[in-house]
UniProtKB/Swiss-Prot annotation:
InterPro entries: NA-bd_OB-fold, Ribosomal_uS17, Ribosomal_uS17_bact/chlr
Cellular component, GO, one term: cytosolic small ribosomal subunit
Recorded GO MF terms: rRNA binding; structural constituent of ribosome
Family (UniProt): Belongs to the universal ribosomal protein uS17 family.
PANTHER family: 40S RIBOSOMAL PROTEIN S11 FAMILY MEMBER, SMALL RIBOSOMAL SUBUNIT PROTEIN US17M
Protein source organism: Pseudomonas fluorescens (strain SBW25)
The keyword Ribosomal protein is assigned to this record: yes
Protein name, UniProt field: Small ribosomal subunit protein uS17
Record flagged with keyword Endoplasmic reticulum: no
Known role: One of the primary rRNA binding proteins, it binds specifically to the 5'-end of 16S ribosomal RNA.
Subunit structure: Part of the 30S ribosomal subunit.
Length: 88
């Protein structure tokens, strides 16, 4: 029996921390409809992602994908930097 290919989970978010070596913290925001009131509410999640070359900085918009656990709290890896933060 042929083994089915797994779909890779990818998310897009903003880098909120790059202080760790080869690790970034990405803020993922999503809109969820409230079950009773019907209003759309912002919900957010912070994920640690592996950044092998330390190329990301705070404010960058990035795409990350799920991977095997690399540390206690790190199981995502950087795929692409979509938009660089504006340097002041």
């Amino acid at each position: 029996m042929a083994e089915a290919e797994k779909t890779v989970r990818t998310l897009t978010g903003r880098v909120v921390s790059d202080k760790m070596d080869k690790t970034i913290t990405v803020l993922i925001e999503r809109r969820v409809k409230h079950p009773i009131y019907g209003k759309y509410v912002k919900r957010s999640t912070k994920l640690h992602a592996h950044d092998e070359t330390n190329q990301c900085h705070i404010g960058d918009k990035v795409t990350i994908r799920e991977t095997r656990p690399l540390a206690k709290t790190k199981s995502w890896a950087l795929v692409d930097v979509l938009e660089r933060a504006v340097e002041v």
